[in-house]
């Protein structure tokens, strides 16, 4: 436990030193800013920087960043390597090292010497030969081509009026010289001011047929010589119209809503103009603002994409048709034209029918939904109101003052019994009750006579209220019998309740005999029970 404070103090003391180590990049060694290199040799420029965190380095030459596109330059972790230096490689080189705390720059000035005697110049530790000349540097080097990848194409064909550049980049020790020849004859005259824009490149512009031939570059120094030959063919332009090659365009079928394309190949001495046209069908001329006449038929010009040049000297163009519809079906032609004329070829496009079934007519639904909401709601409501009014009127007109007795149905006979006494005055199955309803007049009260009763009839006023019209209906009930009091005659049949009896009974009560047959006539109900 006693060692813990001491260990803690030791760790705390080490923290400042660790923080002090972190910082911007710093120089790890001295450099010689002035570097001298011989032509055609390899140069290495060091960038001795360090830091925590480790810095990232970037090289520039005369303010331009050196990247992988510079074929003879290679950026290494420890510096920059330049192979087979040329005179154009001379300049100011800067190595810039950067981390999260800052940056540091290391500057070099590179001088390229054409020929140097031993001991006359000391390129320094950063140079290609160190502090003193080695035996290899004192020897001569034969010339050699440094960019053979740019010399692979030795046969070049160009049309009249075009240009061509022939390259023969080489290096050697001492610095080699280059000489150009045509058909084994030395070129003594420059055809243009930019004929030799660079030392190792021959530029031929505005070619003419007489410029065709073999061009040879000869590179030599004291150690030897090398050469390379190019064959240039200047093609005389033939004055002819373009020719459509191959079988395209061809007839094509596409699904409804699908995508397809036509293609067209045109051979021409110069880059032609390729245009796609679509024939205007009969009756649809008014839908197009402008048309052209080809072969006696009218066509509309379609948008055309880029024209691609092919290695065989032909030109290619494609027409893309996306989301095909029935309107896209028809004849298409590819037209190739130049200053000498034009050629064309036609093809047909067929669009298959839409597999989806047609939907309901849109015009009918739009006209229905276009009505205002009050009209849509009010028309059915008004119809319901009118229908209800008509039904109510019909119900009112069906009500009659009193139906004739002869038209009422005759129910079955129910003999009098003791059930009448049990139910009291509420249920009178054996009473003969005739009801005659008349609207708007007060009739006689009801007379209910029990059999064998000598007391006067009980009076039960009946008042019906119509729930629809709120009018009061008075009913009169009369006791009917066929025989006299004490008679043993059978109950009178209901056939005696004819119109004459009813007309006589409605104003007053008449007794016909023993109350053995009960008949209840209701005007509103239209039945006899």
UniProtKB/Swiss-Prot annotation:
The keyword Translocase does not apply. Disulfide bonds join 47-95, 168-217, 264-334. Residues 1-20 form the signal peptide. Has a negative effect on cell proliferation. Residues 21-374 are extracellular. Residues 396-529 are cytoplasmic. Glycans are attached at residues 107, 227, 251, 289. SMART domains: IG, IGc2. GO terms for cellular component: cell-cell contact zone; Golgi apparatus; Golgi membrane; plasma membrane; transport vesicle; transport vesicle membrane. GO terms for molecular function: fibroblast growth factor binding; fibroblast growth factor receptor activity; heparin binding; identical protein binding. InterPro entries: FGFRL (IPR052615), Ig-like_dom (IPR007110), Ig-like_dom_sf (IPR036179), Ig-like_fold (IPR013783), Ig_I-set (IPR013098), Ig_sub (IPR003599), Ig_sub2 (IPR003598). It is a single-pass type I membrane protein. This is Fibroblast growth factor receptor-like 1. The chain crosses the membrane at residues 375-395. The keyword Nucleotide-binding does not apply. It comes from Rattus norvegicus (Rat). Residues 117-152, 405-427 are annotated as: Disordered. PANTHER family: FIBROBLAST GROWTH FACTOR RECEPTOR, FIBROBLAST GROWTH FACTOR RECEPTOR-LIKE 1.
